[in-house]
């Protein structure tokens, strides 16, 4: 049985979303201290000054759907959380990362962004004039 990624049903999409992206095998990647990610991030940062990490909350939890099912039948799985960033921070310049942290943000996600000084995002249309 194979699974794909997606998004939980919410106020923006009552059916949720099936993205059909493959899922990372975090337990296997942990065995070599996330070398795949370290290599991938460093190669990208060799080419660009900064890197935006989309769906940053996915490092903490992600929506898993059995291939062929609707997003309504998905379930939450735990990501590698702060352990991932603790490991890769030894070999990757986290100061060059930007987190797409829009939508629901977990308390532990915000703590990690603060710990490593990784900036999040603000969308002008979503800010009140008081924040400008």
Regions found by a protein language model. Give the residues of each.
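Alpha-amylase-like alpha-glycosidases and glucanotransferases acting on alpha-linked glucans and related
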Residues: 1-130
């Amino acid at each position: 049985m194979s699974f794909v990624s997606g998004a939980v049903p919410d106020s923006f999409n009552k059916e949720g979303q099936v993205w059909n992206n493959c899922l990372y095998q975090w337990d296997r990647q942990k065995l070599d201290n996330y070398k795949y990610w370290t290599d991938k991030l460093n190669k990208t940062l060799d080419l660009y000054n900064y890197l935006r990490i989309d769906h940053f909350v996915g490092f903490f939890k992600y929506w898993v759907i059995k291939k062929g099912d609707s997003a309504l039948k998905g379930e939450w799985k735990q990501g590698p959380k702060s352990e991932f960033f603790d490991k890769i921070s030894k070999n990757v310049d986290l100061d060059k990362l930007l987190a797409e942290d829009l939508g629901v943000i977990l308390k532990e996600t915000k703590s990690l962004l603060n710990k490593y000084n990784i900036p999040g995002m603000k969308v002008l249309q979503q800010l009140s004039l008081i924040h400008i």
